[in-house]
Amino acid sequence: VITDVNTGEVRALVTYPSYDNNRLSGSADPAYMKQLQEDLSLPLYNNATQAKKAPGSTFKPITAIAGLEEKVIGLYETIDCTGEYKEVDPHIKCWIYPGHHGPLNVVGGLQNSCNYFFAEVAHRLATNRDTLVYSTDMGVDTIRRYASMFGLNRPSGIEIPETTPELTTEDPERSAMGQGTNSYSNVQLSRYV
């Protein structure tokens, strides 16, 4: 999916595998249509608009913005990535584990796509600053609110059928890294990015 960076308008959209449009126009080719319908690679299925998947690290900028706006992190404050985040069970391993990134600020967290950094930001978003009580619901609600600000709570608006996006419903630490139950199509993610 290629979008205009200024407007979000879709400029090009392709899916794979494909099929020969010429064999479906004009006179019908029932044998070819049957072949397409029985093909296990699903060439009639538009992966760009219908296939949903976890956004992964493309979601991390939303978490960074949420952390900064909610003032649970400062622009220059560092979080020390030890390679394994142990505040939740099961523990979350950074992609660099058994190595570690060490101290990172928000820019470093994004540059290194550090799972530990974003798990800690989510944990802070889920912790009441007055009572220091941790609430999964509070963390998830905050992540959902910020994802919605970027339009991830609704279809992209492209003029062909598309799947409905799914905002996370659990596990703020994993959701903050683009895992959890976040689920979006490529066209929805392209409009956000």
Q: What is each residue range found by the language model?
A:
Residues T3-S57, I62-V193:
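Beta-lactam-recognizing serine transpeptidase/beta-lactamase-like catalytic domain environment
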